[in-house]
């Protein structure tokens, strides 16, 4: 099961809205790319590199400068952030 922390869900919604507003049609493509990344994470959650202890991992979103940051908790995936790769690195660490 994949669960989004509330702040991560808000980030994703805000980023989709940004792409829809500023780049017509891109919000849908961004959302699809995040969904594909989540599918890959669900299939092989431990395949992605550790960023920080304990067990914080990150998977790149194809074609967009974003990463899905997550932890594995009891076999489930908790998404901590859908983070822009070049803005405010590590801002989501306090969400653990």
Label the model's feature ranges.
Residues 1-33:
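Arg/Lys-rich, positively charged N-terminal/basic patches that mediate binding to nucleic acids
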Residues 23, 45-52, 87-90:
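Short, charge-rich, low-complexity interaction segments located
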Residues 43, 47-77:
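Basic/aromatic recognition patch in beta-strand/loop cores that engages polyanionic ligands
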Residues 66-67, 71-96:
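Enriched for short, Lys/Arg-rich terminal
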């Amino acid at each position: 099961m994949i669960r989004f922390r509330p702040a991560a869900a808000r980030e994703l919604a805000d980023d989709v809205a940004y792409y829809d507003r500023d780049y017509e049609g891109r919000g849908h493509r961004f959302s699809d790319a995040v969904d594909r990344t989540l599918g890959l994470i669900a299939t092989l959650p431990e395949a992605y590199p550790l960023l920080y202890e304990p067990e914080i991992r990150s998977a790149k979103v194809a074609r967009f400068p974003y990463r899905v940051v997550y932890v594995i908790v009891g076999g489930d995936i908790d998404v901590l952030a859908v983070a822009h790769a070049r803005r405010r690195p590590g801002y989501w660490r306090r969400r653990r």
